[in-house]
Amino acid sequence: METITTKFDNFGKLSISENRRYLMEGDKPFFWLGDTAWLMLLKLDEDEIYTYLRNRKGKGYNVIQTVLIQSPQDVESSLAPGRKDVTKSEYWNFVDQILDMAEQMGLYIGLLPAWGSLVKSNILNMETMRIYANFLGKRYQNRKNLIWILGGDVRGDVGYDVFCLEGEILKSYNPERIIAYHPFGRTSSSLWFHNEPWLDMNLFQSGHRRYDQASLGEWDDNAERETFFGEDNWKYVDRDLSYDIVKPTLDAEPSYEGIPQG
């Protein structure tokens, strides 16, 4: 496997602009062009990930959004079909190798510690999250190409205290590391965490099940709770930037081209 090394003077130096509205890489604006490969670490081998990352790098992507633990079954069983065993050190050594690979290509990894279902199911609670977040904070505090993304397709009020604990612990290990929160479809992280010091920027998810987001079925527990913007995802940006405390905001998951209703 060929090694690709891409060097940028400001790579790994992500920060928030002086006016608090944008991401910066060194002294230049940073445009987050992300791709979601949520199960990349759990399902692909090193060669497959190399092929994927090289493809995305060639297309101009600069952030890959992926998750470390995606479902309760990943934790409860070491025999989850088609998945790596997250309870073994071999998995975490593999993650280290992939982070190295991405860094060599000049790619940031938007790393989601655990999908929101683990908080909803109480597998990650105040006690277990404290252990897990400290483990991650110690292991990855010096990674230059890492962006923390908390949440995972979940409303913040499902486990507000747990998510805040996670953010506070991770921020304590590296205060300069960007931390965001991936919310439930058709919501923004600003609805719950905007004033939290650990949250550096907001993410919203305009949704991808159906572009107008008008009728998503029984699973959509957000139908009547928040403002409905339909196709106008720019309105999330407008709302987030209207708050007294200003933070950058980004559509972390808009419509996908391969979904029939997207």
Language-model segments: what does each one mean?
Residues I4-Q213, N222:
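Active-site mouth of glycoside hydrolases
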Residues P175, E196-G262:
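Catalytic-core region of carbohydrate-active enzymes that cleave or remodel glycosidic bonds
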